[in-house]
């Protein structure tokens, strides 16, 4: 009974490895099975042999009173390898949707379809006993961000200077609600990848989730390979209901982790597409705004974006979302206008700069962070003010080209500030 097999280990294997394992355990017609069914059969065989089987996932509580553990690999959507959680366990540990749970599972009996959870070993990467006494997310006190997320990476081989420019122009803190305002083809996805890379390198204590809504499948693969964090996606060929379900699960998971005083960062691409998805899903209220947006449609994406906050009691939820503009669609403009004043940090990208192939194509004069004095120390703050005074008379393109040329001459922002003889 001491042998243990984990569901997560099986999910990490390639289909070819799983097939070899299935054949080793003499599972019938394994080659014709899909990956989920194959894992199901392998686990069932192991459970019958007396192995202890471990499973994990993110809880979704259904209206009927029971729940299922959904897996991040399936983007938290229902699948054959979900794990059933009984109402007794939900009550015992007072579990809610979004809780990340690890435990011991048993194989389904004759007329059952799912594995079921028998023992909980961890809740939100914490001891189950500690999880009982946590404060609900809505009752925590929100504050302005006061702890800096450093974007600059000490890597001399990096040619891309967008992380350093963000540190200078629009510093990001833990609990920031940031908006990247971007026309099409201005390099917003690459900018998000750079931010993700910086956070993974400089702040390993942060739990990083990249949420891609309505994006191209090849971009999803690119993100998964380049980002050291959790990448959750719903591509453009999926229905809007699926976009919504994925986004709701991600934000619930993040809230539960913040209740455990964790620092969570969500990078969302893009909030405009999420707004469109909610607009499709929400039942019509009869009041329609310009561009075909229903009056009630943006309530839920606002609640998603508004969840970002720095918590006084410990923990923070940072959301950095991209908003699309100049797409030629009135709906996108309306959605952007609704979100315009809600963030406390804005990075604005400019099409004219991108057309000159200058990257990052940032409009420095329009980008900035509110209450940046809480994030940046006094001497650096004075120097950024001086820098802005120098850049202000220049045009958008000249300003960014001037800044990039100056940054090329120095290895770090600290060195750059030293070279400014003020």
From Swiss-Prot:
Function: Facilitates transcription termination by a mechanism that involves Rho binding to the nascent RNA, activation of Rho's RNA-dependent ATPase activity, and release of the mRNA from the DNA template.
Record-annotated Rho RNA-BD domain positions: 52-127
Organism of this sequence: Cereibacter sphaeroides (strain ATCC 17023 / DSM 158 / JCM 6121 / CCUG 31486 / LMG 2827 / NBRC 12203 / NCIMB 8253 / ATH 2.4.1.)
UniProt entry keywords in alphabetical sequence: ATP-binding, Helicase, Hydrolase, Nucleotide-binding, RNA-binding, Transcription, Transcription regulation, Transcription termination
The keyword Hydrolase appears for this protein: yes
Enzyme class: hydrolase
Similarity-based family: Belongs to the Rho family.
Residues spanning the membrane: none
GO molecular function, one term: ATP binding
Chain's gene name: rho
Protein name, per record: Transcription termination factor Rho
GO cellular component: cytosol
EC number per UniProt: 3.6.4.-
């Amino acid at each position: 009974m001491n042998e243990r097999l984990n569901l997560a280990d099986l999910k990490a294997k390639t289909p070819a490895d799983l097939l070899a394992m299935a054949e080793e355990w003499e599972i019938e017609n394994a080659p014709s099975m899909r990956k989920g069914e194959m894992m199901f059969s392998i686990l069932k065989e192991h459970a019958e042999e007396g192995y202890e089987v471990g499973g994990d996932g993110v809880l979704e509580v259904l209206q009927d009173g029971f729940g299922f553990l959904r897996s991040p690999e399936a983007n938290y959507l229902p699948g054959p390898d979900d794990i059933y959680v009984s109402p007794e366990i939900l009550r015992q540990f007072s579990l809610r949707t979004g809780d990340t749970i690890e435990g011991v599972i048993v194989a389904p009996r004759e007329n059952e379809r799912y594995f079921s959870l028998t023992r909980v070993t961890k809740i939100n990467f914490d001891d189950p006993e500690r999880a009982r006494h946590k404060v609900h997310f809505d009752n925590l006190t929100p504050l302005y961000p006061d702890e800096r997320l450093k974007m600059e990476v000490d890597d001399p081989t990096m040619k891309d200077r967008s992380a350093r420019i963000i540190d200078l122009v629009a510093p990001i803190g833990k609990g920031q609600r940031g908006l990247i305002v971007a026309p099409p083809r201005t390099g917003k996805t690459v900018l998000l990848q750079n931010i993700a890379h910086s956070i993974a390198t400089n702040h390993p204590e942060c739990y990083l989730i990249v949420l891609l809504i309505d994006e191209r499948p090849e971009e999803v693969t690119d993100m998964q390979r380049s980002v050291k964090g959790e990448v959750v996606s719903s591509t453009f060929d999926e229905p809007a209901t699926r976009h919504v379900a994925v986004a709701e699960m991600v934000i619930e998971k993040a809230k539960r982790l913040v209740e455990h005083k964790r620092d969570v960062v969500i990078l969302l691409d893009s909030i405009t597409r999420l707004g469109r998805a909610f607009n499709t899903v929400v039942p019509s209220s009869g009041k329609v705004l310009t561009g075909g947006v229903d009056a009630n449609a943006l309530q839920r994406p606002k609640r998603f974006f508004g969840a970002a906050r720095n918590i006084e009691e410990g923990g923070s939820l940072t959301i950095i979302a991209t908003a699309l503009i100049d797409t030629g669609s009135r709906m996108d403009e309306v959605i952007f206008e609704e979100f315009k004043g809600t963030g406390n940090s804005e990075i604005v990208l400019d099409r004219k700069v991108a057309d000159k192939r200058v990257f990052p194509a940032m409009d420095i004069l329009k980008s900035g962070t509110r209450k940046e004095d809480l994030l940046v120390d006094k001497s650096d703050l004075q120097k950024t003010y001086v820098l802005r005074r120098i850049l202000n008379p220049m045009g958008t393109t000249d300003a960014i080209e001037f800044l990039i040329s100056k940054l090329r001459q120095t290895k770090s922002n600290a060195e750059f500030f030293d070279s400014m003889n003020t």
